[in-house]
Amino acid sequence: MIQFTVDERKRLRERSSLYPDTIQRLKNETDEIFHGEIIVPKSGIANWTLYYYCPDCSVKLKFDRTSPHRHRCPSCKKTFTGEPYDSSWWGLINMKNYEAVFSMAVIWLATGEQAYADKAIKIMKEYAAFYPDYEVHGDIPYNGPGRAGAQTLDEANFQRTFAM
């Protein structure tokens, strides 16, 4: 699938100079993943991200991409370990990765900065290496199972965003 023709890419690059704030916002949003270590699960262990909340005060846990096994509530300051928090953390990692890959591709299309394309490609290659062996999981009949996510819809978003 060709998302943009050569002429469309050329026009996009020409027009992107008119919107430096937008390009900078995309760079800021991808900064942690662009400059950080590539974190991709070796097995399909992602769970529902709705579990990533404090069971005591219902506040979303503070996400730290470098802490897959310790999850802290910003309100009551409790730290949670184990399931369902660890696998929900992986679901969030997968989501943040595919969103960053898409944004990095847009940055590259708009600016020609090859480093963004290179990082996006590296992340996608990491997934390509492990995704075929991700276990299909989830047994809610009306949702369908997932691999990189908790359900079929998560899976569709994951793959669609990479394909774009």
Name every feature range the model reports, one short phrase each:
Residues 1-164:
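Extracellular glycan-targeting catalytic surfaces
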